[in-house]
């Protein structure tokens, strides 16, 4: 059961799998295991696909769960949490555990993975999640969490109610989320998130070009990226950007705008990738004729273009390094300015950042020269 096996169930069955569970797995898996245990036929079970001799049999889909609170609490007692704690401690860090508060995403970015849960959005209640956090704190002394939702707190007033529930339970936690800049700007969301313990938020900034954002069907504005970043920093919440290069129609001018945005807004971290055509997406349909024999992740390596973009894979690999160096340079300059104004702000990390400026500067110049050469040879 996975998004990949749901999309490519024939390959999994041909490789020897007995059954593939399509979509959500909890109810179907429970019923399937019961039938196997009782040596009963599963041929009429909703939500599975299997082979009958050489024929693929796809049963009707199972209706998606709407009230996630009906599910029992995750069986953390089956996990050796102490072993994970030890690994984190060896790296000088406190353990962080993953929690899923929602399923699905109602937005329609045309390049995004077709979610296993469909274009919908169901969530646990703030009270359920607070109860789970309380259990993890009491039993494993865990207070750091990664909320692994595609979109955290989309429902109106969810984050505000979550903040209230945590206060009522006297829980002080630190957590990281993924969100959208337009969602963060609604009502008093950032205030409630900061009060409840939000440490860092990863947002899909994607591009500094409004033209590219519109082409992606992203549904966000550059002005929202700027405003959300500003407000998060005011609340001392770290903000990190997902950045995507290589989308159809992207020019070197669009790339320059993205780099300029990163340097100006100074996110606390960045994750850089190239546009990737996942089967089941609108973007895949747009570029599938260029893929030839390539298909999905098996034919792609790090930052490799699978379709004919404006530039080739070598360009984007070099661009990845260049963007990170320019980003680190701009961080060093900012740290230097802050320390000049207020020397008490100096720290080992800031000092290291400033010293690395002298490494990144000549290296970035060489990368820029190589990129310019690649751009000219591409004309």
Task: Tell where the protein language model's regions lie, with residue ranges.
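Radical SAM enzyme core and accessory elements
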Residues: 105, 282-288, 294-296, 300-379
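Glycine-rich beta-alpha loop elements in corrinoid/cobalamin-binding modules
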Residues: 1-65, 274-280
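Mobile, glycine-enriched helix-loop/loop "lid" segments at the mouths of ligand-binding/catalytic clefts
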Residues: 62-81, 285-303
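Short, hinge-like loop/turn segments at secondary-structure boundaries
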Residues: 14-17, 37-40, 192-193, 219-220, ...
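Flexible glycine/acidic-rich beta-alpha junction loops that bind and position SAM and/or redox cofactors
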Residues: 4-9, 53, 107, 157, ...
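Catalytic cores of alpha/beta
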Residues: 8-14, 249-264
